[in-house]
Amino acid sequence: MYTDWLIDKLRCPGNLTSLKLIGHSFESDGKLYNVKNDILSIVYPDDIDGDDAKYNRFYNLFAPLYDLNERVMGKLLTGVDMIKGRKQIISLLGLNPDMRILEVSPGPGVFQKGLRTEIGENGEFVALDLSMGMLRQCQKRNGSLNVQLIHGNALFLPFADDSFDALFHFGGVNLFNDPQKAISEFIRVVRKDGIVSWGDEGFSENYRDERRKKILLKINPGFGKPHPLIPDSVCNIKEYDVYEGLGYLIVARKK
């Protein structure tokens, strides 16, 4: 199910108290969080609202169609080779073999093969998503990669402080109810001097295709959203343009 290391790091997302393993469930203060089909569901709060609820419903429905949509529409709409773009992003993270990493909001797992290659077969790999539909797509795509999947909320990560060597997130910051809180959580669960990285769609200053820009903004207003502020709790900050100027990536170290 889950490694002993991860079980030790799991926490109640509401108050960060330790969890007790009982059969195929985890318990905290009388509340049970169940594991079904090898995925622990530990979402907090119970009544997700706002954009988080709206996009969760959408992604649960959209999950089975993600790959088809990317193949048919991705290149046509953006003009970008997504596979090449993902390889570039992974190469910028600075991952090393045997690292313990958390991927937040993996979607259908399109980065996971590359991430597993970077940390090797002995690295601990955990992925958390609010969409159960997307987690099931991760299982179908990457069942052999030994990724430990968690159904949870990026704004209330169910892990102890300083648990991971690295955290990676791409593609959901613009959709969170509170992007700044999510980034604070990213930093909290990474050890001192660990890698914290996040990014999303957004036009670079040098992007000049005005016609395509108008089309993309109409389809996805997230392209026009300002980037979240970078907290003072990270250092060695590097900012990259990715996906040929249609996205950004922040890679930093926790102070």
Label the predicted regions.
Residues 218-234:
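Short alpha-helix
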Residues 1-57:
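N-terminal auxiliary segments of SAM/dcSAM-dependent transferases
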Residues 8, 37, 43-94, 110, 195-220, ...:
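Conserved class I S-adenosyl-L-methionine
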Residues 166-178:
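A short SAM/SAH-binding and catalytic strip from SAM-dependent methyltransferases
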Residues 180-192:
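A short glycine-rich, Lys/Arg-flanked "PGG" loop and its adjoining helix->strand segment in the class I
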Residues 100-156:
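Class I SAM-dependent methyltransferase SAM/SAH-binding core
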Residues 155-166:
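A short acidic, Gly/Pro-enriched loop at the edge of an enzyme's catalytic core
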